[in-house]
């Protein structure tokens, strides 16, 4: 296995280095050929880095910057203030070839904008799309894109998302002819706005893609499709609704309620039985395990973590980035698009 270097925006996210540094420690422990280039404030990071094992510290290069991009500022303001920030420096390291990929939990709009500005897009890609794997109740996963990089998308752009999602599913899920579906408010031919209906007609004509039609949001976790295509506005809402529902289910089972002693005892035994029997299934829908959306369509791997991610969730975002780099996702997307367009 070859050595791999990731650039990490240590300051990105709601909790900064208190989360990112313990998470990268887990990644270093799991991957002996992994190293990091970190970008962040030395005064905040040094105590946490010094607590890591010496063998891990030897695989970390630290670059100090006190500048960060705030999570709540508009996109244009974020770009103007980005020079010298931890996010921009991490992306510039990837652009220079000093790292094979970047992970950040910072401002989504700024990350998407800077990544498109600094990292070369793949040929024939109009716009990259935020892409992730969502869990299904049968233990398998589905690819979903776009999740917020493009709030608006016309039919041509949605078809391009379908092409990229198709290749991503082939590589990451080891599928042949993945089933593609278009997110809509119904499955009937006349449902949806004009863009959705036009996209539906275009995809029906693509015999190189296994397009199966519309899918509704209540079926997203039923594995009716391997790839779910949507604009960034709809995708972001749908994904957060899924994650919120999953978190509420998990917390509901753990949360104590003011019942009588007898009810509490009965409930405790019941919940214990449920957890023993369904623990693995519950973990399959744990949003932490699926944290990290890839900005698909760039020549390097860029992964966006949830800003509010905890240590385990951030570790999974790093782990997903590593897996995509090892799988050569950017090259596979480029080769796959060339193959698809040659067959048109």
From Swiss-Prot:
InterPro entries for this protein: FA_synthesis, Phospholipid_synth_PlsX-like
Q: Which GO terms describe its cellular component?
A: cytoplasm
Record's superkingdom?
A: Bacteria
Which reaction is this enzyme known to catalyze?
a fatty acyl-[ACP] + phosphate = an acyl phosphate + holo-[ACP]
Signal peptide start-end: none
What EC number(s) does this enzyme carry?
2.3.1.274
Q: Which Pfam families match?
A: FA_synthesis
Keywords assigned by UniProt, alphabetized: Cytoplasm, Lipid biosynthesis, Lipid metabolism, Phospholipid biosynthesis, Phospholipid metabolism, Transferase
Q: Which GO terms describe its molecular function?
A: phosphate:acyl-[acyl carrier protein] acyltransferase activity
Q: What is the annotated localization of this protein? A: Cytoplasm
Q: Which GO terms describe its biological process?
A: fatty acid biosynthetic process; phospholipid biosynthetic process
Q: What class of enzyme is it?
A: transferase
Kindly tell me the pathway this chain contributes to. Answer: Lipid metabolism; phospholipid metabolism
Family designation: Belongs to the PlsX family.
Function field:
Catalyzes the reversible formation of acyl-phosphate (acyl-PO(4)) from acyl-[acyl-carrier-protein] (acyl-ACP). This enzyme utilizes acyl-ACP as fatty acyl donor, but not acyl-CoA.
PANTHER family in the record: FATTY ACID/PHOSPHOLIPID SYNTHESIS PROTEIN PLSX, PHOSPHATE ACYLTRANSFERASE
Q: How would you summarize the oligomeric state and partners of this protein?
A: Homodimer. Probably interacts with PlsY.
> Any idea what this protein is called?
Phosphate acyltransferase
Species, as recorded: Actinobacillus pleuropneumoniae serotype 5b (strain L20)
